[in-house]
Swiss-Prot record:
GO terms for cellular component: cytosol; peroxisomal membrane. Component of the PEX1-PEX6 AAA ATPase complex, a protein dislocase complex that mediates the ATP-dependent extraction of the PEX5 receptor from peroxisomal membranes, an essential step for PEX5 recycling. Specifically recognizes PEX5 monoubiquitinated at 'Cys-6', and pulls it out of the peroxisome lumen through the PEX2-PEX10-PEX12 retrotranslocation channel. Extraction by the PEX1-PEX6 AAA ATPase complex is accompanied by unfolding of the TPR repeats and release of bound cargo from PEX5. It is found in: Cytoplasm, Cytosol; Peroxisome membrane. Its main location: cytoplasm. PROSITE patterns: AAA. It is a peripheral membrane protein. This is Peroxisomal ATPase PEX6. GO terms for biological process: protein import into peroxisome matrix. Its EC number is 3.6.4.-. CDD domains: RecA-like_PEX6_r2. SMART domains: AAA (SM00382).
Length: 1000
């Protein structure tokens, strides 16, 4: 890769040109006369440090270009007469095989589209070649590339880039945006210089690199005051780049140093882009006035003393953070010559993990916390408004905590600018529960502004842990500008049920709140894991424990009531993994309850897209960049991760990143689908028992033989709702319950797994004993949890094996408490929910004794599709089963599977045939092992050697000696020792059961 000087060719083309020295370095001297096209990869400079624009382009040689330079057409960099461009570009030869474009969509000027639409396809192609210089077989086009300003742009194609060929299907579409995007607001010839100018104000996403500053600035310049505009604003104000200007909005005013933005960039022409320090001052204003001042840098005087106050927040109010904050505050003013005035805001970032052990010798790592200070007073010998802080002269002191509204992240993404730990953004369309939380908090803000205190309190609850309740609260609070007081109740648990323990717990919570609540206006008091300190007094085993539990519950209820009514703009939010364990007295104080479910497929897709964004992926490791390959289908990844929580997804992304460290390429770690699939499989295997994560089994229809009729019935029941859900949108109930019954060993479990594999459904197997629990009510709760996990992992199959042990006829059981009857009743209720609101969840049961099942299970809407899986009654069906079981065997040539089937009785089940084939393979292996021993002994005798068997395998044996070939005699030997698992009498019994159920 070469850093080349960037030159503009002042032409419009789809090819670039290289200077002779670069051409020779890339392609040699012989390539000048070569007729084959050459291509390069360009990486354009970008103000977005996480997203660099890379283009593949055809290139030619230009002897007139200066040494070490590359000439780019104006349509590549959107250059105009008044817009300066970057001075350099990264360039390298592209030596890989370029893909051909199968299809291409071009957006055209509407007038041009109307003209071309009257031409034939061949005439359209000729026009594109003549007018836009698109050479078929040579030109490379990239998605979003401007082919000709104001007339033509690439909208989409079969690949991100590729060669335009004669076989490329070109689709032309009209698009007025092509014209609008080409218009440049900065192309002026004559205008009057303005003293002030109204513009929009926006926050920079990332700090601008020092090499992008024009003119260059000393290292000690206050970079927080850097502001950036397009050149048209500088021209209208009549000031050069690097000039100090005033930014004014109503009573707010600030001094900034104005710099020009180089092309190419995606910034707006009528906006001022500033750092979070400046944006915080003007956070309530969308537009500001830029005014030319009569001010020079050398007129700033050095202040003698500056007094700062702390902006109230939970971190700034805690003593344990003061040493590390003071250290970074001193660094902030010593590293740069900061220019301040009274009322300015000062941002300080630090690593909170080092707070408890911080010393001046420790250099903290990755910053994760931001606090703010306000300039209260400046002592100086001059009367100037703005002063420089010189760390060797100016005396700094901090005083009180002051109140100020927090800047919402919707206005300024300060986490990204300061490279703090990123917070997931909840899209309201994909996450309805996040939208509801935002709506409630916004309503609380509006009521507070009108002096109406509604005492808002919210409970976030879920049926599974680690679904992101804390992440949701932090994200929404940051987006809306709420201060957050977070207390994790897991750290407050106490083993002693005493009044003193209750007082300490409540006192600790109140102390956390009281230190800051007086200094903030919009605040959320967030208590997570409430169920760890709150207990229902009725569930206690003695009066003392019941009394202590009631005392804690009353104190917590009073705390919620007090802070939400006494302090305006205060919202209480609690979280729990089991809403039923929250005592009634506390729950009565909660006005809103929001269920936070396990992410759906759409929500998981949003999370994977966010986690694999270059900024999020590399924010903690900026020196070693990771990128996700373009061919990774995140939609498929979201399907494979069904049932996983946000914490699991975050762990998967981290593991994927570490897994691909070994494939280092150009300082970028390229993540591909193989890495992601491997990590997801490992995560599922590791956590399946603890989190109950369902899997997609690996059983195909080829593994099953002799069930063609049953397969057709299954396709009608399951395939139809999945492929055509619109047919059931009118209110028609789908059939989601299937019952397999028949003799044991006929493939009921295997068939259920094949269903899940064939339709890419997650598979959730439930055994009867694991539902039973000694505590009253827990067995029914286990049934509810099973169906809830299936809904979280949909599309999903719940498979109840040996259903007769789970749901026997009610009233016939002798168990105390009637637990089996209650399990059946709960199962019936859940099955009724499947037919109405359980889209994507299918229930399959398997039993050998359908006559023992509760009759209510077999009614319509539940297990209403009963399929008998019997024993194969023809030689052909038996041969199909043997063929499926032996498809991975090496059979002797000439062996006929039908001949094997003819020797088998008609009471062999599928399990019996499995035993037959397994024993035949074992017989073959035993036979081959004996033959190998004979060959080894014979070799030693003939050669008068005493070599080991291992040496014989490694050096003497050939491929045929190692191959296990199953012969007919192996099957005959296996059949002699095989006893059918179902007798003739039992088979007749199952046939009578079949006829009785089919006649109902």
């Amino acid at each position: 890769m070469v850093i080349a000087s960037l030159e503009s060719t002042h032409a419009i083309s789809t090819s670039i040109v290289l200077s002779s020295d670069l051409w020779t370095e890339f392609y040699g001297t012989e390539s000048v006369s070569s007729a084959s096209p050459n291509y390069v990869k360009l990486t354009l400079p970008s103000y977005n440090k996480w997203h660099h624009q890379a283009l593949i382009s055809h290139c030619d040689n230009d002897d007139s270009l200066p040494f070490g330079s590359a000439g780019l057409p104006t349509n590549f960099i959107k250059q105009s007469q008044v817009r300066p461009m970057f001075s350099s570009i990264e360039i390298e030869p592209y030596v890989q095989q370029l893909p051909n474009l199968d299809n291409l969509v071009l957006s055209l000027n509407p007038d041009l589209f109307n003209e071309l639409n009257q031409l034939s396809k061949e005439e359209q192609r000729k026009f594109l070649t003549l007018r836009f210089n698109l050479l078929f077989g040579i030109t490379v086009l990239n998605v979003n590339q401007v082919v000709y300003p104001a007339f033509c742009k690439v909208t989409s194609s079969s690949n991100d880039f590729g060669i335009l060929t004669d076989q490329t299907q070109i689709v032309l579409v009209p698009d007025s945006n092509v014209v609008e995007q080409s218009r440049s607001n900065d192309e002026f010839t004559e205008f009057d210089h303005l003293f002030s100018l109204h513009v929009k104000i926006q926050s920079l996403l990332d700090p601008v690199p020092v090499e992008f500053l024009s003119p260059p600035q000393p290292d000690t310049t206050d970079n927080d005051l850097f502001a950036f505009v397009q050149p048209n604003i500088l021209l209208q104000l009549g000031v050069p780049s690097g000039t100090f200007v005033r930014v004014i909005a109503e009573e707010q005013e600030m001094l900034v140093q104005l710099f020009v933005l180089f092309a190419p960039n995606e910034y707006e022409c009528d906006s001022l882009y500033v750092s979070p320090r400046v944006r915080y001052v003007f956070m309530n204003h969308a537009r500001v006035i830029i005014q030319r001042p009569n001010l020079a840098l050398n007129r700033f005087s050095v202040s003698n003393a500056v007094t700062l106050s702390r902006i109230g927040c939970q971190i700034n109010a805690q003593r344990r953070y003061q040493d590390i904050i003071s250290h970074h505050l001193a660094l902030y003013f010593s590293e740069k010559q900061r220019i301040v005035k009274v009322g300015d805001l000062i941002p300080i970032t630090f690593d909170s993990n080092y707070a408890s052990m911080f010393t001046d010798d420790i250099r903290s790592g990755q910053h994760d916390t931001l606090v703010w200070f306000k300039v209260e007073e400046i002592e100086s010998d001059s009367n100037e408004e703005y002063h420089i802080i010189d760390s060797s002269i100016t005396r700094l002191s901090t005083v009180k905590i002051t109140s100020r509204e927090l800047m919402p992240k919707s206005i300024c993404d300060y986490d990204r600018f300061y490279n703090l730990s990123p917070l997931f953004h909840y899209d309201e369309d994909a996450f309805p529960f996040a939208k509801r939380l935002k709506d409630i908090l916004n309503t609380a803000i509006k009521c507070s502004a009108r002096n109406v205190n509604v005492g808002t309190s919210i409970m976030l609850h879920s049926s599974s842990p680690n679904v992101g309740k804390t992440m949701l609260t932090r994200s929404v609070c940051a987006e809306l500008g709420f201060h957050l007081i977070h207390v994790d109740c897991l750290s407050l648990t106490s083993n002693s049920n005493t009044s003193d323990a209750t007082n300490k717990t409540i006192g600790y919570i109140r102390a956390k709140i009281e230190t800051i609540i007086s200094y903030v206006e919009k605040v959320v008091i967030f208590l997570s894991h409430l169920e760890t300190i709150l207990e229902d007094e009725q569930n206690q085993q003695d009066n003392t424990s019941s009394k202590m539990a009631r005392q804690m519950n009353v104190e917590m209820a009073d705390l919620i009531e007090e802070y939400t009514t006494k302090y305006k703009g205060t919202v209480f939010v609690g979280s729990t993994n089991d809403i039923d364990n929250i005592p009634a007295i506390v729950r009565s104080r909660i006005k809103f309850e929001i269920d936070v479910p396990v992410p759906t497929e759409k929500q998981r897709l949003q999370m994977f897209r966010w986690y694999f964004d270059p900024y999020v992926l590399n924010s903690q490791t900026p020196k070693l960049r990771s990128l996700i390959s373009h061919n990774v289908p995140l939609q498929t990844v979201s399907v494979q991760s069904a049932g996983l929580t946000p914490m699991d997804i975050r762990s998967i992304v981290k593991a994927v990143k570490y897994k691909c460290y070994q494939r280092l390429k150009q300082n970028d770690l390229l993540i591909d689908m193989t890495d992601i699939t491997a990590v997801i499989n490992i995560a599922r295997d590791r956590f399946s028992d603890s989190i109950g994560a369902p899997k997609i089994p690996n059983v195909t229809w080829d593994d099953i033989g002799g069930m063609d009729v049953v397969k057709g019935e299954i396709m009608d029941t399951i395939d139809m709702p999945l492929k055509h859900p619109e047919l059931f949108s009118s209110g028609m109930k789908k059939r989601s319950g299937i019952l397999f019954y028949g003799p044991p060993g006929t493939g009921k479990t295997l068939l259920a797994k094949a269903i899940a594999s064939n339709f890419s459904l997650n598979f959730f197997s439930v055994k009867g004993p694991e539902l039973l629990n000694m505590y009253i009510g827990e067995s029914e709760a286990n049934v509810r949890r099973v169906f809830q996990k299936a809904r979280d992992a949909k599309p999903c199959v719940i498979f109840f094996d040996e259903l007769d042990s789970v749901a026997p006829k009610r009233g016939n059981q002798g168990d105390s408490g009637g637990v089996m009857d209650r399990i059946v009743s709960q199962l019936l209720a859940e099955l009724d929910g499947m037919s109405s609101g359980g889209d994507g969840v299918f229930v399959i049961g398997a039993t050998n004794r359908p006559d023992l099942l509760d009759e209510a299970l077999l009614r319509p809407g539940r297990f209403d599709k009963m399929l008998y899986l019997g024993i194969s009654d023809t030689d052909k069906k038996q041969a199909n089963i043997i063929k499926a079981l032996t498809r991975k065997f090496t059979l002797e040539s000439g062996i006929d599977i039908l001949d094997i089937a003819k020797k088998c009785p008609f009471n062999y089940t599928g399990a019996d045939f499995y035993a037959l084939c397994s024993d035949a393979l074992l017989n073959a292996m035993t036979r081959v092992a004996g033959e190998v021993d004979e060959k080894w002994e014979k070799y030693n005798m003939e050669n008068k050697k005493n070599i080991s068997l291992r040496y014989w395998f490694d050096n003497v044996a050939n491929e045929n000696d190692l191959k296990v070939v199953v012969k007919l005699q192996d099957f005959e030997l296996a059949q002699q020792n095989l006893i059918p698992s179902v007798s003739e009498d039992e088979l007749r019994h199952y046939l009578r059961l079949k006829s009785s159920f089919e006649s109902q």
